[in-house]
């Protein structure tokens, strides 16, 4: 583990795999309260299940993006936990801050785990150092 306070690899991988589903929620609902149990942690038994969950979520997210009109981006969106507001702003800012920034952050953490376990890090914007060898 990168640090004792770091999220365990299995939990981190499940979170990254499930984040596209969270993006869909931001685009298709006015709010999400984690305390209501509508977004529960992904249970998995293999890396294949994680990839499948990510791919399915990414396809749903692509469809949701295509169905989101310009006016919807300005609509209010709220994230909470048992009634406590964690974020409140436009759907655009919710999507950017709560979904995109979150995905980038945890994807980078996952890359650190891969590197520390001598697993090739896949390309993001071009060939990774592992792919260039």
How does the language model describe each region?
Residues 25, 30-69:
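Helix-adjacent hinge/juxtasegments
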Residues 67-83:
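Acidic catalytic patch
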Residues 56-71, 91-93, 128-133:
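Short flexible/disordered coil segments
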Residues 1-39, 80-133:
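Short, contiguous alpha-helical
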Residues 22, 60, 71-74, 120:
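A general structural signal for well-ordered secondary-structure junctions
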């Amino acid at each position: 583990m990168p640090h004792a306070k770091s999220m365990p690899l299995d939990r981190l991988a499940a979170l990254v795999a499930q984040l596209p589903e969270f993006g869909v929620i931001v685009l298709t609902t006015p709010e999400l309260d984690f305390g209501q149990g509508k977004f529960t942690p992904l249970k998995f038994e293999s890396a294949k299940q994680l990839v499948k969950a990510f791919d399915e979520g990414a396809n749903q997210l692509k469809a949701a993006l295509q169905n989101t009109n310009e006016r919807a981006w300005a609509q209010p969106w709220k994230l909470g936990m048992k009634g406590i507001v964690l974020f409140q702003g436009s759907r655009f800012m919710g999507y950017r801050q709560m979904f995109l920034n979150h995905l980038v952050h945890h994807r980078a953490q996952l890359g650190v785990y891969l590197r520390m376990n001598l697993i090739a890090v896949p390309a993001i914007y071009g060939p990774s150092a592992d792919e260039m060898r």
